[in-house]
């Protein structure tokens, strides 16, 4: 299963992109980059603290809960790939998943590379590592950065070995995830899309269902 922003929208999570995502007249594309963090880490952390404050008020919805139930039914035959960084899948109870863009509740040391969970709100501006005292950054894949090799390997394995791929709430334009549906089709899988509206991949999937994830995903049970 592959999920995107559409599944979290039903929990009230904003996209943080476009006009609705402006913060102090900055776009996400202006702040979520290695260059922005190197230039002004304080500004970037202020933005992430703002996002964390918003996300702390959000809860998993019936679509997240259904995915957990499917995982419990299917066991190791299921793998969840999400583009979302809000942590709602984990909050719902999903365990077999790849958060390919990272998790906003996880930080990484820019010095020693140690990764740790952190739900402190707000984080101290310019938080530092307890081990080496170097600056911490969000453990998130920023614009211009590559996905982590282990996640890419695990996703490639899951996509090429699956019999069924469910694509829920994705725009179909952000790569490499935008290519997963065609990869699964080429490998012989049945591909079903659930989204509010048609996407660039709607014509290649076997079934495209339009509607809210929180309404349609529970029907899979």
Could you tell me what each predicted segment is?
Residues 1-221:
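Conserved catalytic core of sirtuin-type NAD+-dependent deacylases
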């Amino acid at each position: 299963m592959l999920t995107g922003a559409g599944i979290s929208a039903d929990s009230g999570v904003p996209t943080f992109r476009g006009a609705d995502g402006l913060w102090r007249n900055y776009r996400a594309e202006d702040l979520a980059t290695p260059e922005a963090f190197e230039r002004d880490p304080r500004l970037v952390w202020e933005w992430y603290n703002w996002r964390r404050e918003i996300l702390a008020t959000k809860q998993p919805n019936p679509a997240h809960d259904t995915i957990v139930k499917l995982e419990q039914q299917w066991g190791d035959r299921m793998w969840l790939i999400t583009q979302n960084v809000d942590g709602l899948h984990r909050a719902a109870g999903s365990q077999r998943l790849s958060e390919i863009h990272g998790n906003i509740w996880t930080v990484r040391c820019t010095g020693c590379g140690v990764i740790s969970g952190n739900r402190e709100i707000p984080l101290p501006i310019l938080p530092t590592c307890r081990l080496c005292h170097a600056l911490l950054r969000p453990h998130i894949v920023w614009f211009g950065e590559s996905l982590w090799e282990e996640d890419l390997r695990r996703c490639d394995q899951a996509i090429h070995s699956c019999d069924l791929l469910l694509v829920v709430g994705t725009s179909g334009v952000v790569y490499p995830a935008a290519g997963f549906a065609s990869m699964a089709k080429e490998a012989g899988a049945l591909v079903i899309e659930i989204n509010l509206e048609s996407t660039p991949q709607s014509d290649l999937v076997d079934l495209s269902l339009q509607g809210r994830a929180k309404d349609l995903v529970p029907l899979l049970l």
